[in-house]
Amino acid sequence: MSKKLYIKTYGCQMNVYDSVKMQDLLYPFGYESTENIKEADVIILNTCHIREKAAEKIYSELGRIKKLQDTRKKHGLSSAIIVVAGCVAQAEGEEIFTRTPYVDIVVGPQSYYNLPELISKVVRHEKHLIDLDFVEEAKFDQLPEQLYPQGASAFISVQEGCDKFCTFCVVPYTRGVEFSRNVEQVYREALKVVSNGAREIMLLGQNVNAYHGKGVDDKIFSLADLIRYLAQIPNLERLRYTTSHPIDMTDDLIKLHSIESKLMPFVHLPVQSGSNKILKAMNRKHDREYYFNIINRLREARPDIVLSSDFIVGFPGETDEDFEDTLDLVRKIKYGQCYSFKYSPRPGTPGATRTDQIPEHIKSERLTILQKELSSQQLAFNESCVGSTMKVLFDRSGKFDGQIIGKTPYMQSVYINNTNQDLLCKIIDVKITKATSNSLTGEIYT
């Protein structure tokens, strides 16, 4: 009889990838995935530590799981094994056992490949097992081949960690320094996901364009080199990468956007602020002029390229003038889509120790203003697509009968009404008939 595995994933695409790999790790040991937490034999919370109160949200979720455990005991059922994985696990460590002693395992993002052994020990009645080692090479060497198909679009992690040490960010402390996977390891995984039906691959990294993996004869591959290599795979039709840092956006990578047809015309390039003063305080290692130059060169290389970014408002010391600089940058660049957040102090980061924190109400006001501008830009871009025919990769069914959802080359979600499920995992010409700020509606072009 198979055992049931429930995984709840928080945060970034890297965590989504890690959760898939956890499924693959545990499948040979008899664990099948379930979306019903009540029937799970193992419950894994794969956590994120980027946003404010991330740890408290996990403790709240663990409290709900404790009530579920108590109910199971009342009915004479065995308790599930509870695992806290990911970046909150790395940051909190033993504190998780102190606050929630019913948790069985705490495992960091670089050591979850040990989950089968850790779970086996809990089955043998060992308690409070923790593994927070930072050995990236071991992680990637131990990860299994893909067992669970990811669908039309697949994530592949090629780089982890970050050496930039932005003053607002916990990634270097929870994911470690930059490490790049071996080229052939990535290539084999790409072959596997394509053989399982993927037509698009998203290459993932906390700082993906800093990729410098070893290939044959120890040749070092840049991200551009890796993309060129993967583009040779038959039946792979689209390649993407995220997330990038402006200072690692090389001439070679920019030029590749003009010549590699499989590389999609969409770049997520976080800038965080439009103020040179705030960029310096954030330790971003570039100024707004440098960022503008990168954007201009990308648009010269690929005139139809669409840009996305991340913004943080209310970083310590941010004045009204600094915020206006951010709005000015946004208006000049004109993004296709963006993510924006209020600054939240992360324990252990330099930004958290500053005494010139911005009041919450000011951060909220600025975020509202920025999001209004970004939403307006996103709507304008989507509306500009109405009447055009776009190539859409259909990757999933919608909530309603006969509804299918896909993605354009520019990462827009497209909804069509069509009962033909054979469209899934195919790229089809779609005429766009309607746009909102968040999605497009269309019909098959005939």
UniProtKB/Swiss-Prot annotation:
So what EC number does this one have?
A: 2.8.4.3
Q: Which residues form the MTTase N-terminal domain?
A: 3-124
- Residues in Radical SAM core domain copies: 148-380
User: What GO molecular functions are on record for this protein?
Assistant: 4 iron, 4 sulfur cluster binding; metal ion binding; N6-isopentenyladenosine methylthiotransferase activity
Residues binding [4Fe-4S] cluster 2: C162, C166, C169
Keyword Cytoplasm part of the UniProt annotation? yes
TRAM domain residues are 383-446
Q: What is this protein called?
A: tRNA-2-methylthio-N(6)-dimethylallyladenosine synthase
This chain is encoded by the gene named miaB
